[in-house]
């Protein structure tokens, strides 16, 4: 079974490249740690290659829909909210991590999204 992690980033926030990289990094760590605790088998299989894909959505509404779809399919997710020290307001949701989880399950949610 192929296991991957997908990070979905909002593009409406006009974050700089460095800011996006930092937020994606936060999402990767949060998602991996969540799955390490909740599903060690998936985590162990994912850990070998650590497949990650970064996708984009246009706004918070689309991001919330991806999150809701993950909840409905019982796929682990983690949300990143910014501290507000630099480019965006405190508490702004910037991205989410879906998985690490089985690729086929994640693709049901994110298969139509575009690469960042």
What residue spans do the PLM features occupy?
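Compact, glycine-rich, soluble single-domain proteins
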Residues: 25, 33-61
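Acidic-glycine-rich active-site phosphate/pyrophosphate-binding loop
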Residues: 1-5, 68-72
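Glycine- and Gly-Pro-enriched alpha-helical subdomains that act as flexible
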Residues: 2-38
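Short, well-ordered secondary-structure micro-motifs
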Residues: 18-20, 66, 90
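Short amphipathic alpha-helices within nucleic acid-binding modules
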Residues: 61-67
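Short basic, glycine-rich beta-strand/loop surfaces that mediate nucleic-acid
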Residues: 7-8, 48-58, 72-116
